[in-house]
Amino acid sequence: MPSGFRFVSRKQGDILRGGEVMRAPYGLEIIESCMSCPHREDRLFCNLPPAAVQRLAAITSAAAYPKGATLFVEGQSPRGVFILCSGKVKLSTSSADGRSLILRVSEAGEVLGLPATVTGKPYELTADVLEPAQANFISREDFLPFLREHGEAALRVAQQLGETYHSAIAEMRTIGLSHSASEKLARFLLDLSADHEEGKGEVRLTLTLTHEEIAQMIGASRETVTRLFADFKKKQLLQVKGSTVIIKNRAGLESVVSS
């Protein structure tokens, strides 16, 4: 059972199998079923034909997880997949000496644990919840027959695996080919802000990652990340207010990347 896994009592609202009306702790509103999900049309795996969605609801167990919960651990035998309905999850790998590298941060609509579940090999990454999240679990015993029965779902799985591959290549390029830590951090912030530009050119981001976690994403030390944020603030490239980062000068960050 994942760390932080919680079934909610009747007094708070049940988290049940099959898509019933539910409430949950951690300030979440549980999405009752894929059929009624307001984001269904925007999400690759969720936007399936009605027959497939109905079958998906029948084999899915919904649960809410707090920040810090672990869905699965690198090297663990694959039990199944998690459809992330809300919240964010970081996917990381660790070395024998305890060093960690965060490969990506997954958001709502992604299916976690796909490669391991499809191949039967151990989970290749560890999945930790960054903020309160709803993640619907489907066991491997149910998921594989579901893919055989519904070709459209199998195609969506292939699409997500392809997107994950391209994302991993981009991350490797950032870490391996960037000349400096400042370039890596600037590129990281630009990637985060790509879909959030506002009318005046400023971009307001809410960071769910700590400086340590950002360091693990860009292959730097926590001290270096903290120093670079201070340097970027001094150069008026950005402002930091708690967990909110306001990018004031996008062109300036782009010049750091291209320098």
Task: Write out the residue ranges for each language-model feature.
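Phosphate-/nucleic-acid-contacting segments
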Residues: 3, 12-15, 20, 188, ...
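A residue-level structural signature of the nucleotidyltransferase/glycosyltransferase Rossmann-like core
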Residues: 81, 103, 135-136, 206, ...
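Cyclic nucleotide-binding regulatory domains
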Residues: 44, 69-132
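Short loop/turn motifs at secondary-structure junctions and domain boundaries
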Residues: 54-55, 71-75, 199
